[in-house]
Amino acid sequence: LIHQLSGLLKSDSGTIHFDGNEISQLSAPKRCDAGMVRSYQITSIFRDFSVLDNVAMSIQAREGHSFRFWRNADNDRSLSNKAMKVLNETNLQDKAGVLADNLAHGEQRQLEVAMALATSPKMLLLDEPMAGMGPEESSRVTQFLNSMKGSYTMLLIEHDMDAVFALADRITVLVYGKAIACGKPEEIRNNSEVRNAYLGDG
């Protein structure tokens, strides 16, 4: 689903509308330019660069700079200030100088979200952000994403049902690619078909 929304996979039928416009024929980069930004199930960060520089590169990409000529945030006060603003927003300010590869898995997911937010998205598509996490780490990332809800529109694909019910205002449940239910969290929680498929009551 996220592949189709983000333009990486062409739909067989139907249309996709975003921000009042029909975007079904737009390429993935054009959809990104329109404000639809995604994270991936497998963490996608620059592991050999600092947390600050990861966010700085996203800012430069948003501003149209080539990565061949990217500027080091430590040598550019304006760029560093912009990147630090994003890190403060995502509670990563204390990790600014840490290599991305040295972060805990949950912190790497936070960094990936920070990189997405640095592009000033209108909608953030999150593809299984809790993938590979234990309960404690998943809970921390859920709290982090919950703190973002008031500022950003997010569409979340996730199999961690605790995270789904903690984060979502509206839930659509897919089974083998078919939508079997759509509604508010309590409506979904009480849906017998959903309970049989996902909540362990079948």
Where do the PLM segments sit?
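Glycine-rich phosphate-binding loops of nucleotide-dependent enzymes
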Residues: 1-202
